[in-house]
Amino acid sequence: MDEALAFRDMISRILTLPPGDDAIVAVKIDICKKYRLHAVPKNSAILAAALPEEKKILRKILLVKPTRTLSGVAPVAVMTSPAPCPHGKCLPCPGGPEHPYQSPQSYTGEEPAALRAREHNYDPFAQVHARLEQFETLGHRVDKVELIVMGGTMTARPAEYQEQFVARCIESMNTYPGGTPAPVPPDVVSVEDANELSAIRCVAITFETRPDWCKREHIDRMLGLGVTKVELGVQHVDDAILTYNRRGCTVADTVEANTLLRDAGLKVGFHMMPNLPCSTLESDKQMFETIFTDPRFMPDFLKIYPTLVTPGSEIEEHWERGIYSPYKEDELIELIAYAKTLIPEFIRLQRIQRDIPAKLIVAGSRHSNFRQLAQNRLTATGRKCRCIRCREIGRLPSVVESDMRVMKYECCGGTEHFISAVSGDSLIGFTRLRFPSQVYRPELENAALMRELHVYGSLVPVGRDADSEEWQHRNYGRALLALAEETATAGGYSRLAIMSGMGVRPYYRRQGYERAGPYMVKELP
């Protein structure tokens, strides 16, 4: 068996196929039979065997689900072990350790990330390794990773668990593909420092938590773990609805958490749940109007999770007794479409609908393509969504010359500047610059806060220049940073503090920034 010859034959045949062609699998199987290979090779192995001039074309042909990394990073979602929420259980909660599913709180255990977690016994190292391997098998690059920690109220877990979980995740990136976890869990500082020069850079870390478990002490711990983004389970902005659903937190908790997170330089996302028990179509419309216009809210990104009735949940009992009824399908589509028309240009609608399998949905929408249904409704009625995701350059190509725009708005007692690079109506990249409402971290004295810098388009590996069709690594980030510095100086600030992912710190050092706690800081002229 000549494996090298088999790969050459396979590559030459695949290069004749169009991108995403189903015939790729048939070619692989045929070559395996011809050369008596013991296993069908992964896409990553095929790419490794290709000549340099073949790799770019080959990657486009082999790439499966290209939207996964279209925003410029590979999202790696991991799940913490099952543990109860500190307040108890909400009315619509679909799972938890005491549920028959014995799943992480607020998950059924059948979601893709939950299945991966359970398969690996909730081991963080193994989960990250498996997801990276899966991405590579699908033909994606994994040079830049956003780690998303899911599974309930992470900030309520013991500090040691939080630290070891994150450290193992980063260790997995640092040692991929052939590494194994160290016998003794590494400390967070050492693995994060090592990641700055790793082949796989962690450019962002997201934690899910509750608004009432996002006080200063929780935020300080998250910053120490390298967290750059926090998703809050807001669900609604009506205290009566929250109380009825036994959320255990209030609108005031959300406002406080939103303010503290922003003034610490972190990015903030909201999870919202229309169609909760006790809510109505009108109150849900009001909810969306409020979060997009009221300066106490206005999240950086948003996930909309229409309420679902799942087996064994308390909401199922309400549904069976006729106390609760989901909205009609058409009503829900129109509600989400209406919400999309309200979204400002500085907010990203990240997701609509949960990953719960249709077989576990007793009542509620079973559509997995809810975003498409809402978008179709907008198109049919001549309306548009102006959110970040709908305008990303990778989804909305443009050949118009680019320019810079600055949008200023008040939020949580401070002033936000959404500085963007655009080409026509396509968004190339942006930065979020905040003049804070208060300073409670010593590193941030007299500093404006750059909470995010992001350039869109397909992921370009660290250290490689962009091709003509790619947008990363073409100095847009540097131009956005320069404009943020100018804006901060004009605002009377003598320093700029950047909320940087550990894998991006070397880039900011090259721009004159130095490490100060969890931030990269520069003295402004």
What are these regions (language model features)?
Residues E401-S402, K408-S458:
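A conserved beta-strand-loop-helix scaffold within acyl/acetyltransferase catalytic domains
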Residues M1-Q127, R131-A182, E345:
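Flexible, acidic/Gly-rich N-terminal and inter-domain linker regions that tether
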Residues D253-V255, T259-R386, V462-A479, A490, ...:
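A structural motif corresponding to the C-terminal lobe/cap of the Radical SAM core domain
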Residues E110-Q127, L147, G151-D330, E334, ...:
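Conserved non-cysteine loop/helix-boundary elements of the Radical SAM core domain that shape
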Residues T80-A83, P97, G151-T153, T209-W213, ...:
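Short, flexible loop/turn elements at secondary-structure junctions
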